[in-house]
């Protein structure tokens, strides 16, 4: 490109870049490309032609205006008419246009050529600068310099891991040119605390406008990442090393106090304060605040911050409530001790203590504590009040309690538990509301966990399954909540006849159950699996875990079907003294709830199962009579009432296959397949007609799931010529069961069992019972007593 008088004009007329981005180097390239002489314009106007010479070219050639932002307004004003007249000129400046004279000159030059903006170096450019192809070295320099050309070059001139003298000198020179406001901002930015505008203004004593202007100056001066507001890491390192430790601690403490005063997010700053081992009162408050902020999203980190706060001088009592909440989410709080709370924290402390009690499985105590926890606590207390039969109190507190929509929905759902068909949709709505916002509290129990037993009671295990799966996927309630929901899911599937999940979850989670509610779940799962496998040895093991749970005498309505498993285990191992008090407590709770039909049927079914387990025909008749007088609206309850009548007939030896078949279908259709198979098996054993017995045994096998085996790793290989069925019979004989019990478990008639036992004895060559048991030990590879 040429001017009217033949002079060459560069294609680029304006170069924009921060200090150290290579503006001067780029100017030199453009001058060299023009092939002529260049005249540099000095701060005093040297190099400028006389006004009378306009529009002639200056005698020296191309006018070069470097660092135009530093030129006095008068010099810039003299350059404007030259540019307007077409004088060949190229200008380099910082990104910020500092005055009207520079703006006018910039506009004139931009009209005659292109504007080039110098961008940070990329990885390819840094690799070229380093002269090596080591990707980690390139990445390190690129990260430390943010692609700033001069900083990257200075780093490249030093050995890896050492300070660059060139960079230190550059930063010191740049710092000396800054005004006091920009220097103060630079030193606080070097702390790497990502301070908000108001906090930065507070610590530097500047207004928001002054602080923002200082950041702009620092960006133009090459101190701050051109694409952000953070200081270039390598520059920050130099500034930090340039300050005495005492000065750094003072700066950090000033930031800590400002963050607390502003109510800002202190977590990022807390990391830096800890890194410099700040132990001032303000730092201690920052650590405590960080623990509070993180207790729900990252309870493990929250506990670490609370420890830091105590180490820095915070009274441990001030961390107790937060520590308890974080511990609840992690499942590390085992006992319900008094949680200290002072002043405004007193109600909060009571709510947390009430939640601790709920997680310990003590709903009554939880309700009492939560009722003292202010308006929010009273709303949180409603499910526990309903669970323990304090229904009128629950209604009153639900009406008076104040809190978010999710908790009001949860209270409404809890009040509706007498009618599962109405309650479950409300629990779902509460769960959805809870998922849309942050509650800011650990729940005594989640909507999903409360909905599960109610849905199962209503014959809707699939909804319970779905809700619990959703809670697990979302991590609701932290690690402890996931653990709890997984155990509940295993129990739901156990009740629905899906034993595989119950076996695997119990194996994975049973040993780590810490809270009282989870120990109850584990005991119920253990007892339920042993009951369904017919394994008396494992039932005794399960009872050993269940007995301490029952001894607590803490009963609530949501536990009713869980307690069925434990009480049946007590009956089976002849521990009747544990049964009466629990049944009485359950009856009291159901009565205080107004004996809602669904729960009344469930309680009556529990009585029936205990009578069947105890082989008490008279008690079976009494329980059946009680159930048949009820008129439940739900299909599951109607199926249970009909089955109760058939149990009474079957145990009396009156087997009517035509009457029994629809009852079995009803139980299976309402997700009680194991109960149906058990009734069919007992009817088959008592049937006098071989054809009827055969039909019922086939039906029992259809209804039965695969045999429950608690130790999935244990396998028995056929030995001594025993068939697969004979090995099954041998295992049950070794566990001490009678022929009748074996027949009930395997859906075989006692005669068939007797035939199998005789064949096994013959194959093993045993002539006495002692020899027979010894031979079984050899074949099965375990002691019968272990069973």
Functional labels for PLM-detected ranges:
Residues 24, 76, 166-167, 192-198, ...:
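Short capping/hinge segments at domain boundaries that bridge a core fold to an adjacent linker or tail
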Residues 132-170, 183, 223-226:
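Amphipathic alpha-helical "lid/sensor" segments that cap RecA-like P-loop NTPase cores
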């Amino acid at each position: 490109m040429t001017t009217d008088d033949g002079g060459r004009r560069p294609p680029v007329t304006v170069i924009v870049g921060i200090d150290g981005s290579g503006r001067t180097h780029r100017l030199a390239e453009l001058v060299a490309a023009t092939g002529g002489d260049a005249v540099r314009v000095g701060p005093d106007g040297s190099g400028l032609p006389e006004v009378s010479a306009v529009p002639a070219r200056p005698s020296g050639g191309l006018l070069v205006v470097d660092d135009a932002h530093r030129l006095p307004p008068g010099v810039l004003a003299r350059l404007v008419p030259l540019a307007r007249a077409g004088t060949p000129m190229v200008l380099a400046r910082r990104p910020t246009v500092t005055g009207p004279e520079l703006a006018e000159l910039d506009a004139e030059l931009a009209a005659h050529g292109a504007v080039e903006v110098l961008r940070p170096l990329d990885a390819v450019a840094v690799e070229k600068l380093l002269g090596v192809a080591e990707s980690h070295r390139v990445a390190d320099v690129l990260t430390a310099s943010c692609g700033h050309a001069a900083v990257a070059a200075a780093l490249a001139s030093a050995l890896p891991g050492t300070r660059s003298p060139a960079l230190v000198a550059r930063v010191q020179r740049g710092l000396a040119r800054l005004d006091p406001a920009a220097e103060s901002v630079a030193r606080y930015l070097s702390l790497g605390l990502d301070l908000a505008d108001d906090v930065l203004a507070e610590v530097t004593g500047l207004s928001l406008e002054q602080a923002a202007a200082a950041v702009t100056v620092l960006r133009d001066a090459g101190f701050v990442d051109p694409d952000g507001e953070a200081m270039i890491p390598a520059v920050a390192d130099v500034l930090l090393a340039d300050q005495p430790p005492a000065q750094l601690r003072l700066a950090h403490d000033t930031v800590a106090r400002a963050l607390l005063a502003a109510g800002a997010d202190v977590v990022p700053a807390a990391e830096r304060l800890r890194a410099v081992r700040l132990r001032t009162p303000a730092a201690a408050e920052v650590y405590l605040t960080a623990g509070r902020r993180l207790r729900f999203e990252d309870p493990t980190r929250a506990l670490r911050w609370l420890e830091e706060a105590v180490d820095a001088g915070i009274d441990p009592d001030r961390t107790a409530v937060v520590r308890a909440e974080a511990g609840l989410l992690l499942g590390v709080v085992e006992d319900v001790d008094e949680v200290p709370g002072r002043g405004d924290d007193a109600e909060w402390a009571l709510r947390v203590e009430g939640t601790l009690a709920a997680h310990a499985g003590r709903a009554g105590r939880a309700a009492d504590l939560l009722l003292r926890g202010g308006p929010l606590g009273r709303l949180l207390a409603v499910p526990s009040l309903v669970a323990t039969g304090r229904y009128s109190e629950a209604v009153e507190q639900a009406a008076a309690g104040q809190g978010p929509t999710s908790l009001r929905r949860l209270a409404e759902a809890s009040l509706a538990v007498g009618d599962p068909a109405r309650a479950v949709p409300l629990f779902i709505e509460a769960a959805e509301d809870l998922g849309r916002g942050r509650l800011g509290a650990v729940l005594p129990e989640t909507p999903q966990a409360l909905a599960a037993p109610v849905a199962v009671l209503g014959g809707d295990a699939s909804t319970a399954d779905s809700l619990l799966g959703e809670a697990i996927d979302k991590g609701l309630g932290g690690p402890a909540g996931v653990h709890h929901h997984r155990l509940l899911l295993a129990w739901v599937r156990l009740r629905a006849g899906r034993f595989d999940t119950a076996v695997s979850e119990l194996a994975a989670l049973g040993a780590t159950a810490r809270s009282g509610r989870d120990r109850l779940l584990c005991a119920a799962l253990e007892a339920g699996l042993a009951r369904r496998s017919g394994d008396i040895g494992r039932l005794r093991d399960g009872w050993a875990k269940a007995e301490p749970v029952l001894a607590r005498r803490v009963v609530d309505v949501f536990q009713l079907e869980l307690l069925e498993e434990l009480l049946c285990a007590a009956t089976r191992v002849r521990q009747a003294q544990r049964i009466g008090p629990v049944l009485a407590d359950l009856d009291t709770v159901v009565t205080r709830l107004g004996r809602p039909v669904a729960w009344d049927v469930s309680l009556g079914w529990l009585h029936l199962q205990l009578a069947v387990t105890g082989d008490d025909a008279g008690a079976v008749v009494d329980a059946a009579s009680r159930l048949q007088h009820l008129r439940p609206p739900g299909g599951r309850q109607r199926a249970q009432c009909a089955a109760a009548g058939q149990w009474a007939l079957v145990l009396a030896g009156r087997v009517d296959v035509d009457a029994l078949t629809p009852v079995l279908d009803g139980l299976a259709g309402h997700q009680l397949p194991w109960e149906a198979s058990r009734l069919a098996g007992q009817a088959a054993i008592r049937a006098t007609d071989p054809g009827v017995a055969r039909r019922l045994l086939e039906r029992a096998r259809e209804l039965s799931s695969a045999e429950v085996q608690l130790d999935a790793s244990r396998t028995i290989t056929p030995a001594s010529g025993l068939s697969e069925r004979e090995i099954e019979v041998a295992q049950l004989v070794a566990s001490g069961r009678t022929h009748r019990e074996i027949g009930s478990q395997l859906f075989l008639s006692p005669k068939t069992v007797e035939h199998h036992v005789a064949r096994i004895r013959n194959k093993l060559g045993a002539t006495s019972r002692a020899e027979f048991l010894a031979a079984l030990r050899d074949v099965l590879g375990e002691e019968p007593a272990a069973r």
